[in-house]
Curated annotation (Swiss-Prot):
One GO CC term on file: ribonucleoprotein complex
Sequence segments annotated as region (Disordered): 1-24
Function statement: Located on the platform of the 30S subunit, it bridges several disparate RNA helices of the 16S rRNA. Forms part of the Shine-Dalgarno cleft in the 70S ribosome.
PROSITE patterns from the UniProt entry: RIBOSOMAL_S11
One GO MF term: structural constituent of ribosome
Keyword Nuclease: no
GN (gene name): rpsK
Similarity-based family: Belongs to the universal ribosomal protein uS11 family.
GO biological process: translation
UniProt-recorded name of the protein: Small ribosomal subunit protein uS11
Subunit architecture: Part of the 30S ribosomal subunit. Interacts with proteins S7 and S18. Binds to IF-3.
InterPro entries found in the cross-reference section: Ribosomal_uS11, Ribosomal_uS11_bac-type, Ribosomal_uS11_CS, Ribosomal_uS11_sf
Annotated keywords: Ribonucleoprotein, Ribosomal protein, RNA-binding, rRNA-binding
């Protein structure tokens, strides 16, 4: 009693539509292990994103400034296909890829209008990790 359902379309899957966005925001999250670059429009909807891990960097190479630079370039190229020209950069985290990612966004052709550090600072919240002994 197995019948084939011929011509059934997949539900829920939308095609990517090409938006035409001039201004946006680049959110750079730079941790000790990875760098994630997300480019959004002014409302906060994601246009493109990239990270050092998605580009094939593994292990300790994910946390390098070069990996952050490549992630920022990849996200910027994908965002510029949607017509993005100007970004405000919001940097979060203590990682080594912060400055490299900002420079890569500028080198890719995006005009940076604002650079703001939005790293969350606890008012004596959680206990921090223990000191490393190398």
């Amino acid at each position: 009693m197995a019948t084939k359902m011929a011509g059934v379309k997949r539900a829920g899957r939308k095609r990517k539509e090409r938006k035409n966005i001039e201004r946006g925001a680049a959110h750079i999250r730079s941790t000790f292990n990875n760098t994630i670059v997300t480019i959004t429009d002014v409302e906060g909807n994601t246009i493109s994103w990239s990270s050092a891990g998605t580009l094939g960097f593994r292990g300790s190479r994910k946390s390098t400034p070069f990996a952050a630079q490549m992630a920022a370039e990849a996200a910027a190229k994908a965002a510029m296909e949607h017509g993005l020209k100007t970004v405000e950069v919001y940097v979060k985290g203590p990682g080594s890829g912060r400055e490299a990612a900002i420079r890569a966004l500028q080198a890719a052709g995006l005009e940076v209008s604002l650079i703001k550090d939005v790293t969350p600072i606890p008012h004596n919240g959680c206990r921090p990790p223990k000191r490393r002994r190398v």
